[in-house]
Regions:
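Solvent-exposed, well-ordered loop and adjacent helix/strand elements within mature globular domains
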Residues: 24-368
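Bacterial N-terminal signal peptides that target proteins for export
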Residues: 2-11
Length: 368
């Protein structure tokens, strides 16, 4: 799937969510649906009361049933601005709906008035036929590091070598040491690993600004999901698996971390792009909670979506609420299939925490 840097970054980002958090045993990426199927989906925001089974993937509706306010109008307009600046193709192809939705937003974004602006809505079938679309999350991590090895900062982040066919274990054993490939040294082997799984992220050198580390390549070895390994080993119950659970296990078992990670021979290399921005497969910088990764066979890149986002607390429990967000489909991933969206949560630990807990359900309306 090495189409370009962005797409591979997305591929690995989504693997973080699906393969770490849901512990899927399938080869590359599978729907995180399997992670929530062992329990009642209603505990994760799925709703059935008052709904009829829907056969069509997308069904036109006269009105959006959720009457709550859209809460991210400003972020959505910022996302559209990024599209206009970075993608003439999407701007041109979707100009009519972008213009209509912009006018609707500026007029107050009342869902009862969509038809007044010539906006037509189609509701997605959902994984179950009752409009319950699976929603996971991804984010951009921030790694604390130094430019040279010093004290606790002794875990290297490598640039792409000319000879990259070394396994993770060989790299940990020093196969790349002294070749001038060290971009940074962090203080955490598990943080470096998760940066590799995300495929890109930010590095804080303690100099007052963040440096973007973009995906540069991979060593050619297959990816093994460490979350699945921890479940199989009996270390973490499947229903408790999340990125945070992996971090907690690593903090409690520092002497075992390297052995676990070496069971995943895949290794990702980076390049320093100080002025870089987090972009999706469409090549457009992403605005948190105004952009999603989708299955482009169902939802083409550039599509405008009204998303009923399930609200969760800091432990990942659904609060009983959904809130409406306007979003644009700007990313893809092999793990995002059918009625499954991956919501971009933003930068840093809190964004990562919520992303790692997200495996909930809500409705999605495609606006045309």
């Amino acid at each position: 799937m090495r189409l370009n840097q962005t797409l591979w970054s997305t591929f690995l980002t989504l693997s973080a969510i699906v393969l770490l958090a849901s512990c899927s045993s399938n080869g590359s990426k599978t729907s995180r649906n399997s992670g929530a199927s062992d329990v009642d989906p209603q505990k994760f925001g799925a709703v059935y009361q008052g709904r009829s089974y829907q056969q069509a993937i997308l069904a036109p509706v006269n009105q959006v049933e959720n009457k709550s306010a859209v809460i991210n109008q400003g972020d959505f307009l910022a996302q559209l601005s990024n599209i206009h600046s970075y993608s003439g193709k999407l701007s041109s192809n979707f100009a009519p709906i972008y213009d209509k939705v912009t006018a609707w937003v500026l007029a107050g974004a009342n869902v009862n008035e969509l038809n007044n602006f010539g906006i037509h809505s189609q509701v997605m079938k959902g994984f179950d036929g009752y409009q319950n679309v699976l929603m996971t999350g991804y984010y951009s991590p921030v790694i604390h590091a130094r430019r040279t090895q010093q004290g606790k900062y002794n875990q290297p982040i490598y640039a792409l070598p000319s000879q990259k066919r070394f396994s993770r274990a060989e790299i940990y054993a020093g196969a790349l040491k002294g070749k001038g490939l060290e971009l940074a040294y962090s203080d955490s082997m598990i943080d470096n690993f998760l940066l590799g799984v995300q495929g890109s992220g930010y590095v804080d050198f303690g100099e007052g600004n963040l440096n973007y580390f973009a995906y540069a390549g991979q060593n050619g070895y297959p990816y093994a999901a460490v979350g699945r390994l921890l479940v199989e080993d009996g270390e973490i119950p499947k229903e408790k698996m999340s990125i945070q659970a992996i971090r907690d296990w690593a903090n409690a078992n520092p002497s075992r971390v390297q052995g676990l990670l070496e069971r995943n021979p895949s290794y990702v290399f980076f390049k320093n792009d100080p002025n870089g921005k987090v972009k999706g497969a469409a090549g457009v910088p992403l605005v948190p909670m105004a952009s999603v990764a989708s299955d482009r066979g169902v939802i083409p890149l550039g599509s405008v979506l009204l998303v009923e986002v399930p609200q969760i607390d800091n432990e990942g429990n659904w609060t009983g609420e959904h809130k409406l967000h306007l979003m644009v489909a700007l990313d893809v991933g092999g793990a995002v299939n059918g009625h499954h969206f991956d919501l971009y949560r933003g930068i840093g630990d809190q964004a990562g925490h919520i992303a790692g807990l997200s495996k909930h359900y809500g409705r999605v309306w495609v606006l045309r």
